[in-house]
């Protein structure tokens, strides 16, 4: 493990019931107890496979390895209830990932890339980002099925890179979802204003803040069911929209056959941004649409977050990953293609400020085709989508905090759970950030809120970057141990090439995402808003690097690919094959 005598002494004390202090947990090794599932360590070589972070102890003269990270009850010898429940089925996992990605970024966010890059430029951007999303989910799938833990990829950053990287990645990712929750709350009222202005925006924020927080206190199986049905509504709405658009393009609307009319006039490429030179401006417009696409695709990694609460994760997670990414690509690319055919990039409605929903290219496409009732129906779909997204925000944020706490990177109380396996304190801490939504109702508060949103977007880029880097280290660790990737429950395709591909381009995107701050002249405020998240990440990393005083990156022999995995391998899962018509139907759909 470590070479110095001092580190060896620390390891020996840790292995044999000496008090051990970690960042947020003061743990005595004597507090861990032998329980079902503990693994006897018969020889010195086996001990070396388990790093210090896993709290081994001696019981009845034998070394045992506790899977509960030292959280135990001293009096009764039983582990305290500090675990989530594995109650998510495959159909839940697939729809949670779909629901987390298909949100306001699709229904409303497509207006910006369409305006700046035109229909073809935006289409190319989303295809390119789709390839990165595929690469990242393949990497995550291989790791999350081998070690299916809650808050998976933040845990992988800690185990495969270093505790400091794990903490920085985890806290930034959690902050991202907590702030996004506030965004969704602020948008709910604006969507309802499509119908009425009689109720103040602050009232809608308060109502949905309370409702969504309470929803996240129910056991995860209820969350899974809610997300399944809401995501089903979104999927059906998009499929219906694609069929509707196909009919409109072929001439069913008031405009007659549209075909590729708008690709000829005003054109397939947008006017561009910043530069007066036409070609240069169009290229910069395409780059801006690429960054917008990167923001929009964030959420495809949610399959990994659910791995710790998935029933039979070795089968359900790979199945979900194989289906989800292609469905997301189909919905995004298909929607963007038809929107580009029905809405010209210079349509003034794309940039109007009368209401938040009025800029949705979906609603504009319906209005341009002359269908009067559908805009109201689709606005209801958007409202449902936002409520679903806000629900996912708290779920993901709370599980990230739970994972940080379980891995000694956050206070111990954040890993407390209800009898139903809900980390309720982590839920309340994440939900508390919903108060920031009220900033949208105050003078000047919206500017501060915009800053916070910039931080959240780049935090998602860091998550994708570290998923790819962690997977590279994971593959190196497997090779070092002599484990063939062919033996894994799920083997990612085209690796390690795709992992390097995703890591390279995510690094480039993180660097260039604030390029508009430099042109046509440097803007200090815009620069700070775009890049403050990078400095925050570095600050958190430096803080935890100083606290842990660890290596910049683990030696390959110290990479932990064993903790939590052995418990899963000891379980015999029932594989429920679909038998009824509806079971088979949902198996295909979800």
From Swiss-Prot:
Record note on what altering residue 356 to H does: In CAN1-340; confers citrulline transport activity in GAP1-deleted cells
GO molecular function, one term: amino acid transmembrane transporter activity
Mutant lacking the gene: phenotype: Resistance to canavanine. Extends replicative lifespan and leads to distinct changes in transcriptional and translational profiles, including translational activation of the GCN4 transcription factor.
Localization per Swiss-Prot or TrEMBL: Cell membrane; Endosome membrane
Keywords attached to this entry: Amino-acid transport, Cell membrane, Endosome, Membrane, Phosphoprotein, Transmembrane, Transmembrane helix, Transport
Quaternary organization: Interacts with RRT2.
Family, similarity comment: Belongs to the amino acid-polyamine-organocation (APC) superfamily. YAT (TC 2.A.3.10) family.
Function: High-affinity permease for arginine.
Name the record gives this protein: Arginine permease CAN1
Species: Saccharomyces cerevisiae (strain ATCC 204508 / S288c)
Organism placement in taxonomy: Eukaryota, Fungi, Dikarya, Ascomycota, Saccharomycotina
